Structure formats: structure tokens, C-alpha cells
């Protein structure tokens, strides 16, 4: 297929595909999905070999969020029966992190519900970061605390944080349809603050919220322009008790096409399969490792994930290897500066845009698999052992 050959060549050169090419990936048929995976897999292996980076989530504060993000089980007005608890103490968070690290994780992601941290919250998280780093040599720590105020990213960096996550989630044009309590521009500004403070920026998306192919391409191109080092790709977990509970729009093949498109647009960036992989990729999860070079180990913030042991077996059986703590995740040209930093330098590649945008046929809608959505009842915030 000429399209795929062209995209592989561009990916190996870190050249931005046209919008038409990105849309064409999403429009490929299920009959061609293995060809798409094989092509994007060449780009993935060129930049990341067969390594898979493991990340581990620690939910520092769960539920009771004042924001109205319609996809979120922790949102204002959510009826989802999730765990709700206030801030974990530093030693509790460090203990939770240790379980993930013992399971093979290289990075710990510290997440807290809410619009954004107060300065007191930043102090609290700083103590947690120091506790984790003191007890686990070489661990990477990423914070995800919401919208940042001036100076807070610098303070997190000084406390030892390596990265900051704040997802764009969807396109600017449809952002107001999923959230009204803050704006798309607010999210962009927070990613920029993380960059400016010298933190490795992590920013991604959520697929399956009813968006169009054009929306998906828009948000991935916006991410490319922001130049994060890591792009988590979430697949909506339709929690009962949230406005998007009935949005079952994804098939395993659709998820693979989305991951392939992200890999072609962001060829040398850590692409992470995040929330919802078990729900939507299901038995095709191993194929997704040919597209992404990073996953979350174990459970998510409010839902259960695949057993940690099963994650490790899946990686090995698919012919991949867990990235070690002594291995550098990013390609050499990105690693020294933590990203390209400018349109002219190397990093993620050229920032040109353009290209016609078409409209792909609506994807086939799978039967709602509510049986696969399990609320987390173990690990952080409970007395039960974590999944790692």
C-alpha cells in the first residue's frame, strides 16, 4: 500500500505526515489492519527497538473533583461508585509506589483529583516525591495534579519530579462539549509551564468519546506542536454514573488504527497505551505493543487493570522486553534536551501543517462490554494489596 510505505519513510525521517495521510490511516478497513500495524511497527522499532516502558499509577487523592469533565468517574456530580479518599501520606504513597516498582515499573505517576494544586498541595506532593526517590534509587516520578499556577512547575522540579502530565484529551473544537469548567487553552498553558520549568512534558488524548476522525487528527497534531516526550493514548472507560456511560464507540481494530496514526505523527515520542486498553483492545493488546512502547502496569486511578503478572507475560510472549531502569527511553536526539524545543531543531520533527482533510466512515460500534469495567477496590486508599 503506497500510503503505508510513504508513512514509514516519513516516520524514519521524523517527517510530519499530511493531515490527509493521517486521516487515511483511520479510514483503512479492518481487512488492512495488520498491514497498518506492520508498517507503524517498523517506525516504532526503529526508534525504540523492542523495549516496553512500564509506568505505575498512584492515585494520591480520589474522587470529589469540582470539575465537570464528562468522561471522568471522579467528576462533579459523578454517580460512579468509586473509591473516594483524601490525600495519601508520603509514606503511604511511597509504599504504593514500591509495589509497582517491584513489579518492573520504571516510572511512578502521582495523580490527584481536582482542578489544580494549591501551594500547600505542592508542598505535600513534594514531600511524597522526596520520600519515593529516597527509598527507590533511579526511579522516575511524574506528577499529574491538574492546572498549574505560576511557579508550581518549578517547585515540583526542585522537589525531584522528572515529568508532568496534563492531557489535552480531545480537539480544541470539541473541547467545550466535554468540559465547561476550564478551557482547552488552560490545558495547553499547563503543558507549556511544565516544559518551561524543565520538566519532561507528558500529554495525550482520550479516544471513544464520540469524536470524529478529524477531531482525533486535530488533537494529535496539537500534541505534536506542543512536543511532549510522552503521549498517553486513553480509550474511554464508560463508567456507569457518568454522562458518557453509553459511549461504546470503539473496536479493537479501531484502537489499533488510532495508535498507528499517533505513531506516524509522533514517530520518536514515547507512545503509551493508557486507560481502557483491557476494555477495548482486549485479546488484541499484544498487537498494540508493535505500535506503542509504553504501558501502565496494573490498575488505573479508579478502575482495575489487567493483572500485573499478565502484563509481563504478554510483553514477553509478544517478543518484547521490559525497559530497564538503566536504559534511556527516548532516542538520543531527544533525550539530552527533553524534547525538540523549537520548530527548527531535531526532536519530534518538522512542524508543518496542511493537507486536505476528509471524512472517514463511522467506525463499527461494538456491543457495550460493561462486564469489563471494574471499579478499583485495592491498592492506594485501601487495606488491600495492590495489583502489580
Swiss-Prot record:
<keyword id="KW-0408">Iron</keyword>
<dbReference type="InterPro" id="IPR002684">
    <property type="entry name" value="Biotin_synth/BioAB"/>
</dbReference>
<feature type="binding site">
    <location>
        <position position="72"/>
    </location>
    <ligand>
        <name>[4Fe-4S] cluster</name>
    </ligand>
</feature>
<keyword id="KW-0411">Iron-sulfur</keyword>
<dbReference type="Pfam" id="PF04055">
    <property type="entry name" value="Radical_SAM"/>
</dbReference>
<feature type="region of interest" description="Disordered">
    <location>
        <begin position="335"/>
        <end position="371"/>
    </location>
</feature>
<keyword id="KW-0093">Biotin biosynthesis</keyword>
<dbReference type="GO" id="GO:0009102">
    <property type="term" value="P:biotin biosynthetic process"/>
</dbReference>
<feature type="binding site">
    <location>
        <position position="65"/>
    </location>
    <ligand>
        <name>[4Fe-4S] cluster</name>
    </ligand>
</feature>
<keyword id="KW-0808">Transferase</keyword>
<protein>
    <recommendedName>
        <fullName>Biotin synthase</fullName>
        <ecNumber>2.8.1.6</ecNumber>
    </recommendedName>
</protein>
<feature type="binding site">
    <location>
        <position position="272"/>
    </location>
    <ligand>
        <name>[2Fe-2S] cluster</name>
    </ligand>
</feature>
<feature type="binding site">
    <location>
        <position position="202"/>
    </location>
    <ligand>
        <name>[2Fe-2S] cluster</name>
    </ligand>
</feature>
<dbReference type="GO" id="GO:0051537">
    <property type="term" value="F:2 iron, 2 sulfur cluster binding"/>
</dbReference>
<keyword id="KW-0479">Metal-binding</keyword>
<dbReference type="GO" id="GO:0005506">
    <property type="term" value="F:iron ion binding"/>
</dbReference>
<feature type="domain" description="Radical SAM core">
    <location>
        <begin position="47"/>
        <end position="277"/>
    </location>
</feature>
<dbReference type="InterPro" id="IPR006638">
    <property type="entry name" value="Elp3/MiaA/NifB-like_rSAM"/>
</dbReference>
<feature type="binding site">
    <location>
        <position position="69"/>
    </location>
    <ligand>
        <name>[4Fe-4S] cluster</name>
    </ligand>
</feature>
<dbReference type="GO" id="GO:0004076">
    <property type="term" value="F:biotin synthase activity"/>
</dbReference>
<keyword id="KW-0001">2Fe-2S</keyword>
<keyword id="KW-0004">4Fe-4S</keyword>
<dbReference type="GO" id="GO:0051539">
    <property type="term" value="F:4 iron, 4 sulfur cluster binding"/>
</dbReference>
<dbReference type="Pfam" id="PF06968">
    <property type="entry name" value="BATS"/>
</dbReference>
<dbReference type="InterPro" id="IPR007197">
    <property type="entry name" value="rSAM"/>
</dbReference>
<feature type="binding site">
    <location>
        <position position="109"/>
    </location>
    <ligand>
        <name>[2Fe-2S] cluster</name>
    </ligand>
</feature>
<comment type="subunit">
    <text>Homodimer.</text>
</comment>
<comment type="similarity">
    <text>Belongs to the radical SAM superfamily. Biotin synthase family.</text>
</comment>
<comment type="function">
    <text>Catalyzes the conversion of dethiobiotin (DTB) to biotin by the insertion of a sulfur atom into dethiobiotin via a radical-based mechanism.</text>
</comment>
<keyword id="KW-0949">S-adenosyl-L-methionine</keyword>
<feature type="binding site">
    <location>
        <position position="142"/>
    </location>
    <ligand>
        <name>[2Fe-2S] cluster</name>
    </ligand>
</feature>
<dbReference type="InterPro" id="IPR013785">
    <property type="entry name" value="Aldolase_TIM"/>
</dbReference>
<comment type="pathway">
    <text>Cofactor biosynthesis; biotin biosynthesis; biotin from 7,8-diaminononanoate: step 2/2.</text>
</comment>
<dbReference type="InterPro" id="IPR010722">
    <property type="entry name" value="BATS_dom"/>
</dbReference>
